[in-house]
Swiss-Prot record:
Matching CDD domains: MobA
Function: Transfers a GMP moiety from GTP to Mo-molybdopterin (Mo-MPT) cofactor (Moco or molybdenum cofactor) to form Mo-molybdopterin guanine dinucleotide (Mo-MGD) cofactor.
Annotated protein name in UniProt: Molybdenum cofactor guanylyltransferase
GO biological process, one term: Mo-molybdopterin cofactor biosynthetic process
Catalytic activity line of the entry: Mo-molybdopterin + GTP + H(+) = Mo-molybdopterin guanine dinucleotide + diphosphate
Entry-linked Pfam families: NTP_transf_3
InterPro entries: MobA-like_NTP_Trfase (IPR025877), Molybde_CF_guanTrfase (IPR013482), Nucleotide-diphossugar_trans (IPR029044)
Subunit structure: Monomer.
EC number: 2.7.7.77
UniProt GO cellular component terms: cytoplasm
Localization in the cell: Cytoplasm
Name of the encoding gene: mobA
Domain of life (superkingdom): Bacteria
Residues that bind GTP: L9, A10, G11, K22, D70, D96
């Protein structure tokens, strides 16, 4: 398997959580970013954390990066992460998917080939660009879009060689697709805690 950098988009303050950094919200005794970090690190060869407040992560064994453009957004975070990646390919994850499965990451990474720029899961609801592999070759196209103020990740795909991973293949290793469960609000965090306590998820 190719050497791959793991990149976590940690962001910063979350208004939907009522302020504070949602990456450090506790879930079943661990922060959300701890859960994501440990899963990604178990598969990837080195780590990058992209954060608005990188000083919060000084104790972590990871390269720390921050946005290089004045405006914020996931595409800006992807750009910052790829700029700091130690390998040609990087697996990118958001910090708010605490049930991300190692097997899902391996399945996505397994789609890497020299002629492919992006490997992205595609469920019936659409693609999952924040649980995907990107080549550093994407940087030129991403920078062009950012300089033009174009922030939609999927719009970048039109200029890149993209391989999708089908929902069928994803369900083979994650039947309930819990890897893609985003925790964006206090209510969703409470539902996740309840699911863990009920033994429906771990």
């Amino acid at each position: 398997m190719d050497a791959v950098t793991g990149i976590i988009l940690a962001g910063g303050e979350s208004r939907r959580f009522g302020g504070g950094n949602k990456a450090f919200r506790m879930l079943d005794g661990r922060t959300m970013i701890d859960r994501v970090h440990d899963t990604v690190k178990s598969v990837c060869d080195d780590m990058v954390i992209v954060a608005n407040t990188p000083l919060d992560y000084l104790g972590w064994n990871a390269v720390l990066a921050t946005d290089l453009f004045d405006f914020r957004g996931s595409l800006v975070g992807i750009h910052a992460g790829l700029m700091s990646a130690g390998h040609e390919y990087a697996f990118i994850s958001a910090c708010d998917t605490p049930f991300l499965k190692q097997a899902v990451i391996k399945t996505i990474i397994g789609g890497i080939e020299d002629h492919i720029d992006v490997v992205v899961p595609e469920k019936k609801e659409g693609m999952e660009p924040l649980c995907a592999v990107y080549s550093r070759r994407c940087l030129e196209v991403i920078e062009r879009h950012l300089h033009q103020g174009r922030m939609v990740i999927k719009a970048v795909y039109n200029k890149l060689r993209v391989r999708t991973i089908s929902e069928k293949r994803l369900r083979a290793v994650d039947p309930d697709l819990v890897s893609f469960w985003n925790i964006n609000t206090k209510e969703e965090l409470e539902k996740a805690e309840a699911a863990i306590k009920a033994g429906r998820i771990s």
